A protein has these predicted regions:
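Conserved acidic segment of CheY-like receiver
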Residues: 2-15, 19-23, 36, 51, ...
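Short amphipathic alpha-helix used as the core "switch/output" element in two-component signaling
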Residues: 41, 63-76, 92
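Active-site residues of response regulator receiver
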Residues: 54, 82
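Receiver (REC) domain active-site loop signature in two-component systems and cognate sites
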Residues: 57
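Basic, Lys/Arg-enriched C-terminal extension of HTH/homeodomain DNA-binding domains
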Residues: 181-203
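C-terminal output helix
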Residues: 86-88, 102, 106-115
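Acidic catalytic/metal-coordinating carboxylates
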Residues: 34-35, 61-64
Length: 203
């Protein structure tokens, strides 16, 4: 099975080459970039991957790359690499969600451990993304009327109350409610509520 995709962004070709050899030997798919802008143009918005990002580069700092990733909706976990221990930069990077901040020279075990943590995070993110996409696809099956009924069921209204709210008979509400449960592939109101809670969870 593919171990995961690691993107490496560093303006030093010798550093890139050394990291690429190490990572390929460990079974990872590797893409290297000396230009942050080239990485940002190529970075995927989905899939399981992480990025090793040099802190200090001439065209754009690693922190600026991280900010741009957030703005562009690139949720890939970031591991920062720095030639020196910059405490303020490390603190900012971690606040913005970096997995780790490593100071060169970096030991192989330390780096591979950070990459495993980053790819575990990426795998969890991808599972949530796929799950959310599946829920959104099911929701698209509902008619506007069924969606109205669904929203009121989630709010805890009884069939009679829903009928009064929407101007329909209780029997018609039951029909719509049954269609909602079938199309959303749930078998209880509790499961329906959980489905929407998962959809609204931004994590």
């Amino acid at each position: 099975m593919d171990a995961g995709h690691v993107f490496v962004v560093d303006d030093e070709p010798t550093v890139l080459a050394a990291l690429e050899r190490m990572l390929r030997a460990s079974g990872y798919e590797v893409s290297t970039f000396t230009s942050p802008s080239d990485f940002l143009a190529a970075a995927p918005h989905e899939g399981v991957g992480c990025v090793l990002l040099d802190l200090s580069m001439p065209d754009m700092s690693g922190l600026d790359v991280q900010d741009t990733m957030h703005r562009n909706g690139i949720a890939m976990p970031v591991i920062f690499l720095s030639a020196y221990g910059d405490v303020p930069s490390a603190a900012r990077a971690m606040r913005e969600g970096a997995i780790d901040f490593l100071v060169k020279p970096i030991g192989e075990a330390e780096l591979l451990g950070a990459i495993r943590r980053a790819l575990d995070t990426a795998s969890a993110q991808e599972r949530r993304r796929i799950s959310r996409s599946e829920v959104e696809e099911r929701l698209s099956r509902l008619t506007p009327r069924e969606r109205q009924v669904c929203d009121l069921v989630i709010k805890g209204l009884l069939n009679k109350q829903i009928g009064s709210e929407l101007g329909m008979t209780e029997k018609t509400v039951k029909v719509h409610r049954g269609q909602v449960m079938r199309k959303l592939e749930v078998h209880s109101v509790a499961a329906l509520v959980r489905l929407f809670a998962d959809l609204s969870d931004p994590s």
